[in-house]
Amino acid sequence: MKILVLNCGSSSVKYKLIDTENDTVMAEGGVEKIGLPDGFLKYKLSDGSKAIRELGLVDHKGAVKAVLDILTDPEVGCIRSYSEIGAVGHRVVHGGEKFSKSVLLTDEVLQQIKDCYGLAPLHNPANVTGIEAVEEILPGVKQVGVFDTAFHQTMPAKSFMYALPYKYYKEDGVRRYGFHGTSHRYVSQRVCEILGVDINKEKIITCHVGNGGSITAVLYGKSVDTSMGLTPVEGLMMGTRVGDVDPGALTYLMKKHNLSADELQKIINKESGVLGVTELSSDMREIEAADKAGDPRAHLALEMYEQRITKYIGAYAAEMGGVDIIVFTGGVGENQTGLRGNVCRPLGFMGVELDEQLNMTTRGTETVISAPSSKVKVVVVPTDEEMMIARDTRDIVSKLK
């Protein structure tokens, strides 16, 4: 079955067309600058090279139409007609407490996603716009929603509750939800395939470290704790997000500088993290280069960033009563060799031992980077959220036939 996977953001639509018969990516690309006069479609050609098609001013419906047109284009397309698309799978950022797994998208489900707008005001409306656009252009084609939050719905209350007055949970849904769930689910399953072990017997810590980052404790195949919270701002220090911070520091700044909630939101989401500390960049490659050139603030940011990851791994190992496997994924986790080494060295007391040579030469490939003598396997696994979405979509739609 050919599955079109869509990730609709506020100003972009990313896509992959995946043939689930053999797990091959037939086409990929994305529309950027939706709603602006210089919108464009970036797509990959069959030889691997990239091309751009100017679109001008388009909305989400126009963006989805542009994606479908490029897929069926007589010269650069890979399918003859829309009818070859068996189903469409959507990344949906927030499913609240309603969704613990991927679901067929119906009017009722769509309304429940809309009910979560307050929890993900930037992402969920864009996700819904994409779903509605597909419904208009491809009526009758089944659509499936795959939620970033779903994998973490197995967390026990002691992990997801905040110690706020209980009424804020009951009335407003304030609790830890966690994100990157599709990635954490994919790499926790994939690492067990690579190692030839049973996920139901393993204690795994998955580290999704990119511009946004989160860590998850996966006990016997289920998420039991994760570093992101009600929003993706909690947890690790990130490219531009603050991560864990004393809430008292935020109320102090609000009062002192007369900040509005929106202004504070912008600071903790867009102006903090690595960018905030270095005042240089949110890109870890640039920060590593600046550190090598002797920039003290870049050095400090790296130390803070790495220490936070180490702390979470240590905490989750304690929570699960040990750890068998540590996984690194995401743009930074897959490629920043120095960071992986610095994160893992303090974990030697837990039996974590890297093969330094293998670690330094592994970038973006599935590789066991721990030494043979290590009590804990450390593995790099490139994430593939789109493949997970495609498989879920295929499984759900196949059962309808």
Regions found by a protein language model. Give the residues of each.
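Adenine-nucleotide phosphate-binding core of ATP-dependent small-molecule kinases
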Residues: K266, G273-V277, M284-E319
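Catalytic phosphate/nucleotide-handling subdomain of diverse soluble enzymes
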Residues: L219, V224-H257, K266, G330-T361
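Internal helix-turn-beta structural module
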Residues: H299, E303-E319, D324-V327, G333-K401
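Glycine-rich phosphate-binding loop of actin/hexokinase-like ATP-binding domains
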Residues: F151-K255
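Short beta-strand-loop/turn "lid" adjacent to the catalytic site in phosphate-handling enzymes
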Residues: L71, E75-H123, V144, A150-S159
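Phosphate/pyrophosphate-binding loops at sites that engage ATP/ADP/AMP, CoA/4′-phosphopantetheine
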Residues: I70-I85, V191-D198, I313-D324
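Glycine-rich beta-strand-to-loop/alpha-helix junction loops that act as flexible
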Residues: G9, H90-V93, V209, V323, ...
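N-terminal glycine/serine-rich phosphate-binding loop of ATP-dependent small-molecule kinases
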Residues: M1-G96
